[in-house]
Structure formats: structure tokens, C-alpha cells
């Protein structure tokens, strides 16, 4: 850890004599009397924290100011590095981060030698841009309230401070104007950031943290803001305002550096906007820093050039969102058009056939009108149909028509056919049967003294007189005794069966008697081998 810092600061001429110090106010007083022709970053750094020193340190979580210092091996170089951490930052060099060094959140680390050896113009802009990083809200969601000291990089550099320089650096996911760091500074700050990320284990949003590094004489950030803004040169404020506007236009939670509470109070709303407009913050893993899109990496000094890449993104996003309803509308428009075309297309072919039919009808009328004999044959089928319907009308009025007779005949035997005389006889029998049933049922209804003919009246007549039990209308529930009705044919069959039975019995009796006498005559000399068997088999 010490070697990269010493190498980065080797090119710097020490502006102050090496005087070891134990507290930050002493280091500030040592840096203040150094004269410099150009407003170098070290002079700006020394002037900024020295003015708010007499303010009340009551808001500081740790009341002891000397705990914010670190004993350093090389006092001149290390003091400048520690003081330039929260304040001195490089000029706006786009969002091109050196991610290849695997150093997450290196934008708040110590400044390198090129930063301190810059000219006066970059110094003013760099001194104004980093200060805006401290003015942003220092709230970090999920950060424990108790101070967590980070382990010292080397045994010689013991950090008794409760809030070391790399404590607030690990929660700044996106660069706040100071992401253009050198490789040396990124290498120096990467182990501290990794160690703190390992101990904390909190995946934070990129811009929730703030550059809360070493604070001189127990000052808070809110106390430093008015003094920092008052000590800025006019050029820094003029150059910073368009850049801050550009940051706000990109919804990166970068309020303007002017010390106004209204701008700083909009952090929550900008956090919500950032969560919406920058989904890569929540989707990135915990230990790896999120890579911004390529549109945010190039940074231009002019506000017009900075705002231009954002405008096409808005158009692209809106155009990406609008094609879906446009496509839906176009599909909805195409569907009725297709339906109309489909409706019109059948109508057109139908309209064309109608015309030939009309022409054919006219031709037929012209052809048939002079020819008189052709009309009577056309009228004859109608007359024939009328005669056929007249013949079928009386049969249709009957209960059992010829159609029903043919259907019954087809069910019995499809090959059989009935003569018309037989069909008439069957229809007459059906009519007589229905009339007899209705008359007897009406008589039963009158006997019950009711004007309505019910099903039980007809069932009583049908079951008793005709021995017919129609399915679904049986009267078994109210009629327990059923009288057997025998016909003459049935009686004749029963008589024939009885005669046959008697004849068989008589024949069997004759055969048994003859077989018994023969056995008696032939069995006088010989005894039967099985005398019981003959009797049993005969009987």
C-alpha cells in the first residue's frame, strides 16, 4: 500500500518541510503558509478545511478531533494525499473508469501526482467538482450506525481514526466527476475497498454514499458546505453549474454544487428516478462495480454536447415503448380492413354470378314467352304436387298414417312390402282402437265426476280389456292384484300341451308294463342279477 503511494507522489515537489503531526489541525496550519503562484490543488485544499475549523464539533459522532488523523511515514506527501481525498479531484474526464484493475469504487481514493501537478485552470474545475461530491447527502442505506474502522494498510500506518479515508469510498457506485483516476491510486485504494466490502457485505446503490473522508476538527459535511461554496472562485462555479445540470439531466443523483438545501433535499426523488432509469445498479453483483452504459462514459465539457447523447436515449426509449401500441393499432386497423376485404371479395364474385342469372332469366322469359306449349308442362308438376298432397292429406289426418306403417314395416322386415288395401285396413284398425279407448276413458272420467280425461282412465281400460301395459304408465302402484286374462288361442295351446303330456305318460306306462311281464316270464329259471335295478329303472 505504501509503495504505490510513494511512487505516485515521488514526482511531486514537497511544498512543506516534513514535520510529523498527530492531529489534523496541525497539518492544516502547516500547509497554509506555503506560498504558490498558481492556485494549485494543495493550496485550495489547505484553504478550504481551515476556514470551518472554529465551528462547533457537536454534530460529529466522535467528539475527539485528534482521532481523525493518521500517523504517516512521509508527512508532506501523505498529508497532501489525505487532505486531497475528499476535496481535490481530477477534472471531468468522462465516466471511463479503469475497471481492469478490479478496484471497485476508486473514485473517492487518494489523489495521484498528476492531479496535484495540474495547471491553474484544471485546478479550479477539479477543486469545484470534487467538492460537489461532499455536498451530496452522506446517507447510505444499510450502513451500520457504529463506526467500523478498516484495517491499516501497513504496520507503520496505524489508523486510530473511527472513519478512515476509505470508509465512505466503498459506497459510491458511480463516479461523481472523479472517476478518471490513475492506475496508481486505483491500485492503492482497491485493497481497502475490497476489505471493507468483505466486512460489510452490503450491496449498495451506486450514488447513495458520499465522500465522507477525513473531516478536520470534528466537522460534519453540512458544516463544510457553506464554507466550501464561499471559498470557491468564480470560474469554478461558472464551470460547475452546466456540468451539474448535465448530471441532473442524466438522473445520476448529482445535484449542483451551490450550497442550497433545496437541491440537496431532492436526493430521495433522484434515487427513485435513478432506480428506474438505471436498472444496472440493482442487477449487478455485490462485489463487482456496475459498468455504466457507453452513452454515459464520454463526458464533454459543454452542456449542449453532454445533453445530446441523453436526448436520443429518450427518443429511443419512447420509440421502443411506442411501437407496441402502434403495432397493436396497426394490427387492429389491418384486421378490419382484411375483414372488409374478405367481405367485399365474396360479394364481388357473388355479384358477378347474379348478373348472368338475371340475364339467363331474361333470356328464358324471352324464349318461353312466345312458346305457349312450354308453359303447361311447367304448371303440371305443381298440379301433380297438389294432387299428391291431396292424397296424402287424409292419410296425414289419420292417427296411423301410411308413413308410420311403412316405418313399422321397415323395423320388422325391410324386405317386406304392403299392399295399399292392407295399409288402409291397418289405418282403420288403429282409428277404431283409439276411438274405443277414448270413449271408455271418457266414461270412466264421467264416473269419477271429472271433466278431465286422465291417463289412469285409459290405462284401466287398456290393461283390463286389451291386456296392454304401455311402458312408463304402469298402474302397479295402485293395483296390487292382476287378473290373468287368457285368450282362446292360449287355451287351445294349453289343451294341446296337456294332451301331449297324457299321451307320453300313457306310452311310458305301456312300455313299463310290457318290460315287467317279459322279465317275469324269463326270470323264473334264472334269478335276475340285479333284481332291484329292473324295478328302479322301470319306475
From Swiss-Prot:
Residues 1-396, 508-539 are annotated as: Disordered. One of its GO terms (cellular component) is transcription factor TFIID complex. Expressed in roots, leaves and inflorescences. Residues 30-50, 103-130, 323-350 have a biased composition (Low complexity). Signal peptide: none annotated. Component of the TFIID complex. TFIID is composed of TATA binding protein (TBP) and a number of TBP-associated factors (TAFs) whose MWs range from 14-217 kDa. Can homodimerize. Interacts with TAF4, TAF4B, TAF8, TAF11, TAF12B, TAF13 and TAF14. Belongs to the TAF12 family. One of its GO terms (biological process) is DNA-templated transcription initiation. Residues 397-470 form the Histone-fold domain. Residues 1-13, 70-84, 183-192, 210-249, 257-286, 298-307, 362-372, 526-539 have a biased composition (Polar residues). This is Transcription initiation factor TFIID subunit 12. Pfam families: TFIID_20kDa. Residues 51-68, 287-296 have a biased composition (Pro residues). Its main location: nucleus. Keywords: Activator, Nucleus, Transcription, Transcription regulation. Residues 200-209 have a biased composition (Gly residues). Gene3D superfamilies: Histone, subunit A. TAFs are components of the transcription factor IID (TFIID) complex that is essential for mediating regulation of RNA polymerase transcription. It comes from Arabidopsis thaliana (Mouse-ear cress). SUPFAM superfamilies: Histone-fold. GO terms for molecular function: protein heterodimerization activity. The gene is TAF12. It is found in: Nucleus.
Amino acid at each position: 500500500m505504501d509503495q504505490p503511494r510513494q511512487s505516485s507522489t515521488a514526482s511531486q515537489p514537497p511544498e512543506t518541510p516534513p514535520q510529523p503531526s498527530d492531529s489534523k489541525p496541525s497539518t492544516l496550519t502547516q500547509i497554509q503558509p506555503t506560498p504558490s503562484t498558481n492556485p494549485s490543488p494543495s493550496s485550495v485544499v489547505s484553504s478550504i478545511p481551515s476556514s470551518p475549523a472554529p465551528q462547533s464539533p457537536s454534530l460529529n459522532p466522535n467528539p475527539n478531533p485528534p482521532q481523525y488523523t493518521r500517523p504517516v511515514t512521509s508527512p508532506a506527501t501523505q498529508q497532501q494525499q489525505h487532505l486531497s481525498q475528499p476535496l481535490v479531484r481530477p477534472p471531468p474526464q468522462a465516466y471511463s473508469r479503469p475497471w481492469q484493475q478490479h478496484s471497485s469504487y476508486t473514485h473517492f481514493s487518494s489523489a495521484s501526482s498528476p492531479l496535484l501537478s495540474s495547471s491553474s485552470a484544471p485546478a479550479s474545475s477539479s477543486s469545484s467538482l470534487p467538492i460537489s461530491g461532499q455536498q451530496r447527502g452522506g446517507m447510505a442505506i444499510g450502513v451500520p450506525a457504529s463506526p467500523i474502522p478498516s484495517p491499516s494498510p501497513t504496520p507503520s500506518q496505524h489508523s486510530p481514526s473511527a472513519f478512515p479515508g476509505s470508509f465512505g469510498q466503498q459506497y459510491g457506485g458511480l463516479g461523481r466527476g472523479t472517476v478518471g483516476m490513475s492506475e496508481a491510486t486505483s491500485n492503492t485504494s482497491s485493497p481497502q475497498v475490497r476489505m471493507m466490502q468483505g466486512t460489510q457485505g452490503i450491496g449498495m446503490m451506486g450514488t447513495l454514499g458520499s465522500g465522507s473522508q477525513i473531516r478536520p476538527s470534528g466537522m460534519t459535511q453540512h458544516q463544510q458546505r457553506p464554507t466550501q461554496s464561499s471559498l470557491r472562485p468564480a470560474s469554478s462555479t461558472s464551470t460547475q453549474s452546466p456540468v451539474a445540470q448535465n448530471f441532473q439531466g442524466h438522473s445520476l443523483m448529482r445535484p449542483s454544487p451551490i450550497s442550497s438545501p433545496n437541491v440537496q433535499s431532492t436526493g430521495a426523488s433522484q434515487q427513485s428516478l435513478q432506480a428506474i432509469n438505471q436498472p444496472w445498479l440493482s442487477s449487478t453483483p455485490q462485489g463487482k462495480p456496475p459498468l455504466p452504459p457507453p452513452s454515459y462514459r464520454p463526458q464533454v465539457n459543454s452542456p449542449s454536447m453532454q445533453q445530446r447523447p441523453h436526448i436520443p436515449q429518450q427518443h429511443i426509449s419512447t420509440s421502443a415503448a411506442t411501437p407496441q401500441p402502434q403495432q397493436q393499432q396497426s394490427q387492429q386497423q389491418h384486421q378490419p380492413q382484411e375483414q372488409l376485404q374478405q367481405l367485399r371479395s365474396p360479394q364481388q364474385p357473388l355479384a358477378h354470378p347474379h348478373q348472368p342469372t338475371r340475364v339467363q332469366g331474361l333470356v328464358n322469359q324471352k324464349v318461353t314467352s312466345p312458346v305457349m306449349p312450354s308453359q303447361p308442362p311447367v304448371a303440371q308438376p305443381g298440379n301433380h304436387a297438389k294432387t299428391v298432397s291431396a292424397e296424402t292429406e287424409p292419410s296425414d289426418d289419420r292417427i296411423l298414417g301410411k308413413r308410420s306403417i311403412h316405418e313399422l314395416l321397415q323395423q320388422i322386415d325391410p324386405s317386406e312390402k304392403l299392399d295399399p288395401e292392407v295399409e288402409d285396413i291397418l289405418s282403420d284398425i288403429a282409428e277404431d282402437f283409439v276411438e274405443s279407448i277414448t270413449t271408455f276413458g271418457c266414461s270412466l272420467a264421467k264416473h269419477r265426476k271429472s271433466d278431465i280425461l286422465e291417463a289412469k282412465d285409459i290405462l284401466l281400460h287398456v290393461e283390463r280389456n286389451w291386456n296392454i301395459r304401455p311402458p312408463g304408465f304402469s298402474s302397479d302402484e295402485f293395483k296390487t292384484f292382476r287378473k290373468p286374462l287368457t285368450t282362446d288361442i292360449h287355451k287351445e295351446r294349453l289343451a294341446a300341451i296337456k294332451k301331449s303330456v297324457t299321451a307320453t305318460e300313457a306310452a311310458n306306462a305301456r312300455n313299463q308294463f310290457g318290460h315287467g311281464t317279459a322279465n317275469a316270464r324269463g326270470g323264473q329259471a334264472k334269478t335276475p342279477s340285479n333284481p332291484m335295478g329292473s324295478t328302479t329303472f322301470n319306475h
